[in-house]
């Protein structure tokens, strides 16, 4: 889920907010400073643990929503990109968006509180979150990593890792956790011997060959594939908006939206049934 720093593609995204026409999308600063036209449809992107530039992801989102607003016949669409649920929560409370693009863990973690309903999924190049791996230099099985140090920048939501990512293969408590902040820091912790093993995602494993010492690292376990991007409606979204968005969801990356999607690495947006992730939701909710 080439390493374009499309932190989204989830997110999503190429014209900047400075070029916004009347029927358009407000940039991050404009969202806070300029009143939106009546009927503006709100969006949010929550993309956790991604690599790349958040400001670039925001510009891609702005461009994508500009295209979507025109296609859907909305007066305007505006959105903001976040890498932390805590910061996204305040934005949601203040602006009450109708729709969101989420990494899978963020979707599961924010679903109940916000009445989120899955509408679609999309693939995303080099943004991560589509599959997870345990890697090591010295261990050759997952069991050999248990009880040892495990570096990860994906441990903020232990429940997501324990009941969804691992598929019951392990719990984070099975390891001596070494929490990291940046994707490359996690990989280098194993390369430099600061941790015996590491939990990383598909974006990180794709960079191993480009990092000094990366050739000595190998996967010892892999998760099932997961959706890179969940497209969801909020419980407060008007039914008319939901119906309209559903009609245009699979055309997000067509026409004027193609450039934004290409820049963000977003591909193949497609609709799903509302209960498509019922099993994962039930497991996460406990």
Please annotate each region the language model reported.
Residues 9-22:
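Bacterial N-terminal signal peptides
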Residues 31-108:
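Extracytoplasmic small-molecule ligand-binding "clamshell" domains
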Residues 36-50, 124-134, 213-253, 259-286:
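Periplasmic-binding protein-like
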Residues 101-114, 191-219:
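A ligand-binding cleft/hinge motif common to bilobed small-molecule-binding domains
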């Amino acid at each position: 889920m080439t390493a374009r720093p499309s932190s989204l593609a989830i997110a999503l995204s190429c014209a900047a907010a400075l070029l916004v026409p009347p029927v358009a999308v407000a940039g991050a600063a404009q969202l806070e400073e300029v009143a939106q036209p009546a009927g503006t449809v709100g969006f949010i992107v929550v993309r956790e643990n991604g690599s790349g530039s958040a400001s670039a992801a925001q510009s891609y989102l702005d461009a994508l929503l500009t295209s979507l607003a025109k296609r859907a016949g909305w007066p305007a669409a505006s959105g903001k990109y976040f890498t932390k649920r805590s910061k996204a929560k305040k934005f949601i409370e203040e602006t009450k968006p109708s729709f969101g693009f989420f990494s899978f863990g963020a979707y599961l973690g924010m679903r109940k509180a916000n009445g989120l309903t899955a509408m679609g999924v999309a693939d995303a190049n080099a943004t991560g979150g589509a599959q997870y791996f345990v890697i090591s230099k010295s261990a050759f099985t997952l069991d050999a990593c248990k009880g040892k140090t495990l570096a990860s920048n994906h441990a903020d939501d232990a429940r997501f890792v324990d009941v969804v990512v691992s598929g019951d293969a392990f719990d984070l408590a099975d390891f001596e956790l070494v929490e990291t902040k940046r994707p490359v820091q996690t990989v280098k912790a194993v390369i430099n011997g600061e941790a015996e093993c590491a939990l990383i995602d598909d974006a990180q494993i794709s960079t191993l060959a480009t990092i000094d010492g990366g050739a000595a690292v190998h996967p010892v376990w892999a998760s099932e594939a997961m959706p890179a991007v969940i497209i969801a409606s909020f419980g407060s979204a008007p039914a008319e908006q939901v119906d309209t968005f559903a009609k245009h969801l699979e055309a997000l990356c067509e026409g004027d939206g193609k450039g934004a999607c290409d820049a963000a690495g977003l591909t193949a947006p497609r609709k799903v049934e509302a209960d498509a992730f019922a099993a994962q939701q039930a497991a996460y909710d406990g």
